Amino acid sequence: MAIERTFSIIKPDAVAKNHIGAIYNRFETAGLKIIASKMVHLSKEQAEGFYAEHSERPFFGALVEFMTSGPIMVQVLEGENAVLANREIMGATNPAEAARGTLRADFADSIDENAVHGSDAVASAEREIAYFFSAEELCPRTR
C-alpha cells in the first residue's frame, strides 16, 4: 500500500450548513490524516484558475459562481491510497447516485452543489495542493 497525499475541498454549500467537523470526522475515521487545512473565500480569478481545465465546458460559469459564493475549506489528506480512499468517502458526483453513508449522499443537495471535491489522481493532487499550499504549510503527521 502506498502512502499518498490528496487534495480536498469542502464546498460553500457544506461550509454554510456547518458540516466541516462531520466531514473531517469521516476523513479521520477512514484513516486519512489532515496535514494542512485553511478556510478561503475564492476570488473569481482564483476559482477560474483552479478550474481552468473546465473553462470550455458549458457549466464553467455556474461552477465559478458557486465556488465564489461563500468560504470553502481546503485540505491536504495523507494516508494509504489517499486519492482512492477519499473518492470512496465522497461518493458519486451526483448525490442521487451516491452510496448511502458517503459524503455526497449525506451532505449534498444536487450535482451542482455536491459538498466536496477530491483529486482524481496523484498527479492532479500534486497540482491542486500546490495551487493552495506552499511546501512549508504541509505538516506531516509523525505521531
Swiss-Prot record:
Residues reported in the UniProt entry to bind ATP: K11, F59, R87, T93, R104, N114
Its primary localisation, in coarse terms, equals: cytoplasm
Specify one Pfam family: NDK
Keyword Cytoplasm, does the record have it? yes
What pairs make up the disulfide bonds?
A: none
Q: Where in the sequence is the active site?
A: H117
Which coenzyme or cofactor does it need?
Answer: Mg(2+)
- Main role? Major role in the synthesis of nucleoside triphosphates other than ATP. The ATP gamma phosphate is transferred to the NDP beta phosphate via a ping-pong mechanism, using a phosphorylated active-site intermediate.
> What does the annotation say about its assembly with partners?
Homotetramer.
* Family named by the database record: Belongs to the NDK family.
Can you say what this protein is called?
Nucleoside diphosphate kinase
